[in-house]
């Protein structure tokens, strides 16, 4: 049995999956915001509860908005303050008495999609999230590749490439990022970035969904904005694909529901790739909000 936990800022979602990777249990509980011991106890109690229910000890994987420090394995996170700076994996292993794996939630999203029936035979899968932020995870041979410092796939914190600056023009905004740097892709390619760029160029704030609706209706500013954004996306995606060369790319997050992306990227990306490279297949995520808990559970698949 595979147990997965999606630990967010407000709730912890638990999921249990059998050997066929079918979900057989679900539970959601509030995330203790400032009580670390209660956070550890909450996770341990869910493990013990479902061990008793299934009559076996499930493997344990956690996905959270952050990562482990490569040197001391403490948690680096902003959205789960109770876990910030704490040795969560070590304390859970001591409490529960078995191995625990922890990964960034974007990596869990990518792993969930990579283990979908249609993608299980693909050698590599790149998951990209175009949501409130922009991030990703890289799956190779069915496993997360997270690198020496657990930051592989953190494409949202690479910088806007020079050809993207040329494309945006001399009036291009230098946007700040939550990581304290400027010019990160997170600030431009996310749903938030989509809105920030519109506000910058047109002097008015609009929600992404309203911009997309206006685009469908042929409103001039929205059409111009979407055209600019699609080319920006193609430039940045091409840079990422050149570095990772994935077989399949899966998009998640709210902006991934904009169907025009799937029409435009295969047409626009090739001119920014090396001449020998082909644009990978780009598809929409199938597992939506359940991707985090699925991927966390699947961290233990061998």
Swiss-Prot record:
It is an enzyme of class 2 (transferase). ATP binds at residues 4-11, 133-140. CDD domains: ASKHA_NBD_ROK_NAGK (cd24057). Zn(2+) binds at residues 157, 177, 179, 184. It catalyses: N-acetyl-D-glucosamine + ATP = N-acetyl-D-glucosamine 6-phosphate + ADP + H(+). GO terms for biological process: N-acetylglucosamine metabolic process; peptidoglycan turnover. GO terms for molecular function: ATP binding; N-acetylglucosamine kinase activity; zinc ion binding. Pfam families: ROK (PF00480). Transmembrane segments: none annotated. Keywords: ATP-binding, Carbohydrate metabolism, Kinase, Metal-binding, Nucleotide-binding, Transferase, Zinc. InterPro entries: ATPase_NBD (IPR043129), N-acetyl-D-glucosamine_kinase (IPR023505), ROK (IPR000600), ROK_cs (IPR049874). Pathway: Cell wall biogenesis; peptidoglycan recycling. Its EC number is 2.7.1.59. Catalyzes the phosphorylation of N-acetyl-D-glucosamine (GlcNAc) derived from cell-wall degradation, yielding GlcNAc-6-P. HAMAP family: GlcNAc_kinase. Belongs to the ROK (NagC/XylR) family. NagK subfamily. PANTHER family: N-ACETYL-D-GLUCOSAMINE KINASE, ROK (REPRESSOR, ORF, KINASE) FAMILY. This is N-acetyl-D-glucosamine kinase. It comes from Vibrio parahaemolyticus serotype O3:K6 (strain RIMD 2210633). The gene is nagK.
């Amino acid at each position: 049995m595979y147990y997965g936990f999606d630990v967010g800022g407000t709730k912890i979602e638990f999921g249990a999956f059998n050997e066929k990777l079918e979900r057989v249990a679900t539970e959601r509980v509030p995330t203790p915001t400032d009580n670390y011991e209660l956070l550890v106890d909450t996770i341990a109690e869910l493990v013990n509860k479902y061990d008793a229910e299934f009559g076996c000890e499930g493997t344990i994987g956690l996905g959270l908005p952050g990562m482990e420090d490569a040197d001391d394995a403490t948690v680096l996170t902003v959205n789960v303050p109770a876990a910030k700076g704490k040795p969560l994996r070590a304390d859970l292993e001591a409490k529960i008495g078995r191995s625990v794996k922890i990964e960034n939630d974007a990596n869990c999203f990518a792993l969930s999609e990579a283990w979908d029936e249609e993608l299980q035979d693909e050698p590599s899968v790149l998951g990209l999230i175009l949501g409130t932020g922009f991030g990703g995870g890289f799956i190779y041979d069915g496993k997360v590749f997270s690198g020496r410092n657990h930051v592989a796939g953190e494409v949202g914190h690479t910088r806007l490439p020079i050809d993207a600056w040329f494309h945006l023009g001399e009036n291009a905004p230098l946007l700040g990022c939550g990581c304290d740097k400027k010019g990160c892709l997170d600030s431009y390619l996310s749903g938030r970035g989509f809105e920030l760029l519109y506000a910058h160029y047109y002097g008015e704030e609009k929600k992404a969904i309203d911009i997309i609706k206006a685009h469908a209706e042929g409103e001039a500013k929205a059409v111009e904005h979407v055209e600019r954004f699609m080319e920006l996306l193609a430039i940045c995606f091409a840079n990422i694909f050149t570095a990772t060369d994935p077989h399949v790319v899966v998009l998640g997050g709210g902006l991934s529901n904009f169907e025009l992306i799937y029409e435009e990227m295969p047409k626009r990306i090739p001119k920014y790739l090396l001449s020998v490279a082909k644009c990978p297949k780009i598809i929409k995520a199938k597992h939506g909000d359940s991707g985090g808990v699925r991927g966390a559970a699947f961290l233990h698949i061998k």
